[in-house]
Structures are given as structure tokens and as C-alpha cells.
Swiss-Prot record:
InterPro entries xrefs: Ribosomal_uL16, Ribosomal_uL16_bact-type, Ribosomal_uL16_CS, Ribosomal_uL16_dom, Ribosomal_uL16_sf
TM regions (residue ranges): none
GO biological process: translation
Protein species of origin: Lactobacillus helveticus (strain DPC 4571)
Protein name per its UniProtKB record: Large ribosomal subunit protein uL16
Keywords for the protein's UniProt record, in alphabetical order: Ribonucleoprotein, Ribosomal protein, RNA-binding, rRNA-binding, tRNA-binding
GO cellular component, one term: cytosolic large ribosomal subunit
Gene3D superfamilies recorded: Ribosomal protein L10e/L16 (3.90.1170.10)
Subunit and interaction comment: Part of the 50S ribosomal subunit.
Purpose: Binds 23S rRNA and is also seen to make contacts with the A and possibly P site tRNAs.
């Protein structure tokens, strides 16, 4: 089931700026291992769901997965072949604004090798560079550069 807000105050939002690092959500709070963003980007609800499915399938329903991001920002698109002007387009989907250093996913209840591979598979579904972090060593970690 795709992640979408139940209701929003405004259907259309400004794009906003993605300057600097994340203010919150920089530390592992629930599981033992996490996936940290090294870049700022919009992550769509479909990308989040694809990453979740990849992790749970690899872990064969073992362990627990926490999704620390939620797509609460709508983005709009005008139809194909529509001329410029005449207002903002219709809402086309939902995105989560992820800044660098944000922990996006957490895993618990599995060994480190399984968690590392599950989060690596999840990172291939995302449009940003990520880093595998553990609760004990949140300062360092291993990154997938590209």
C-alpha cells in the first residue's frame, strides 16, 4: 500500500529549499542498523515502498523494519502538450524531503551481514548515495558511492 497522507491542508505546495543537513532523525532510534542519506533529494512514495519490499523479501519476513521518512509533500505536473501558463498543474504524487545525514530506514532483529545486504538492496531503489550505519558506530560507516 503506497504511503500517502490521510488529509492535507493544502493540495499544492511550494517546492522549497533543501539546504544544509537534516535537523532531526540523525541517529538510530529503534533498530540496530540504519541507512543514512549522504545527499539531499526528494524520495517518492513508490521508491520508499520499493525499498521496503526489497528489504523484507531479502530478510524473508525475519526481523523488523522501521521507515523513518514519510511522503507528506505533494508535487504537481501539467499534462503532456499543455502550454505554459494557466495556473499550477494538478497534484501528481507525494514525496518525502530527505536531507543529508537523515536516517531513512532502520532494521533490527537480524545479524549484521543480513542487515547490510538488505539495506544495500534498498539503497539501489533510491536516487541518492547512502551509508550503512550501526547503533554503536553512528559517526562512521560504509557508503555506497554511486
Amino acid at each position: 500500500m503506497p504511503l500517502v497522507p490521510k488529509r492535507v491542508k493544502h493540495r499544492r505546495e511550494f517546492r522549497g529549499k533543501m539546504r544544509g543537513a537534516a535537523k532531526g532523525g540523525k541517529y538510530i532510534a529503534f533498530g540496530e542498523y540504519g541507512l543514512e542519506a549522504l545527499e539531499s533529494h526528494w524520495i517518492t512514495n513508490r521508491q520508499i515502498e520499493a525499498a521496503r519490499v526489497a528489504m523484507t523479501r531479502y530478510m524473508k519476513r525475519g526481523g523488523k523494519v522501521w521507515i523513518r521518512i514519510f511522503p507528506q509533500k505533494s508535487y504537481t505536473a501539467k499534462g503532456v502538450g499543455v502550454r505554459m501558463g494557466s495556473g499550477k498543474g494538478a497534484p501528481a504524487g507525494w514525496v518525502a524531503v530527505v536531507k543529508r545525514e537523515k536516517i531513512m530506514f532502520e532494521i533490527g532483529g537480524v545479524d549484521e551481514a543480513t542487515a547490510r545486504e538488505a539495506l544495500r538492496l534498498a539503497s539501489t531503489k533510491l536516487p541518492i548515495k547512502t551509508k550503512f550505519v550501526t547503533r554503536s558506530s553512528e559517526v562512521g560507516g560504509e557508503s555506497n558511492e554511486g
